[in-house]
């Protein structure tokens, strides 16, 4: 078992939601935003090195290419920089806390949030974990979730306990359009 030492991970500065990583001499711009991804990248690096020590042909360039190429669609995924749009499929308090931490560390302000939830998830805790992240939250009913989808009005009622401005929308597309019209600096 190889466990990376957290003190050996040296975060680097970059643009908002960029994740520069320095571990064991491997300096890479990770495609996975969020400092919570750096220990994961260190584990991946150690795993590749362990395989190399066992005779696998893995060179330093391959490790760096892997670190740069790793993706998790819809997990703090920047899909546009102008306008600034991030997609995150967090569906529980822990995922929401990771998103909130990443947004706060990036010092992103003036953001709008678009959110839909499943009725069987811990919606109130998830909303509380995102407190302070959005100047305005637009709620939607997830279109493909079937009977598990929490109605946009119900989500808005819960969200009003946490967010200063909440608007009910019919679809995510409507919410994104409205957020852009309202002039927010970015949308998550």
Regions found by a protein language model. Give the residues of each.
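Hydrophobic anchor at the start of a short beta-strand
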Residues: 1, 111, 165-167, 188
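Nucleotide phosphate-binding/pyrophosphate-handling subdomain across enzymes
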Residues: 24-136
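A structural preference for short, hydrophobic beta-strand core positions in alpha/beta folds
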Residues: 3, 78, 168-170
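Extended acidic/charged loop-beta regions that coordinate divalent cations
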Residues: 1-27
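A generic short alpha-helical patch detector that favors 3-5-residue windows
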Residues: 13, 36-39, 147
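C-terminal helical cap/extension that packs against the catalytic core
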Residues: 15-20, 84-86, 127-186
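Short, acidic/turn-prone active-site loops that include or flank metal/cofactor-
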Residues: 6-8, 116-118, 141-146
């Amino acid at each position: 078992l190889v466990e990376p030492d957290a003190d050996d991970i040296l975060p680097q500065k970059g643009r908002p939601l960029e994740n520069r990583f320095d571990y064991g001499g491997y300096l890479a711009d990770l495609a996975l935003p969020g400092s919570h991804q750096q220990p994961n990248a260190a584990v991946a690096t150690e795993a590749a090195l362990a395989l190399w020590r066992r005779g696998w042909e893995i060179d330093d360039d391959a490790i760096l290419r892997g670190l740069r190429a790793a993706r998790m669609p819809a997990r703090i995924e920047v899909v546009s920089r102008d306008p600034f749009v991030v997609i995150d499929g967090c569906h529980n308090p822990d995922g929401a806390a990771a998103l909130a931490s990443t947004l706060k560390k990036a010092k992103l302000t003036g953001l709008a949030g678009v959110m839909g939830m499943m009725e069987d998830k811990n919606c109130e805790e998830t909303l509380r974990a995102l407190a302070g992240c959005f100047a305005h939250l637009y709620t939607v009913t997830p279109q493909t979730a079937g009977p598990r989808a929490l109605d946009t009005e119900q989500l808005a009622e819960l969200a009003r306990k946490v967010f200063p401005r909440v608007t009910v929308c019919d679809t995510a597309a409507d919410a994104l359009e409205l957020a852009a019209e309202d002039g927010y600096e970015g949308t998550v």
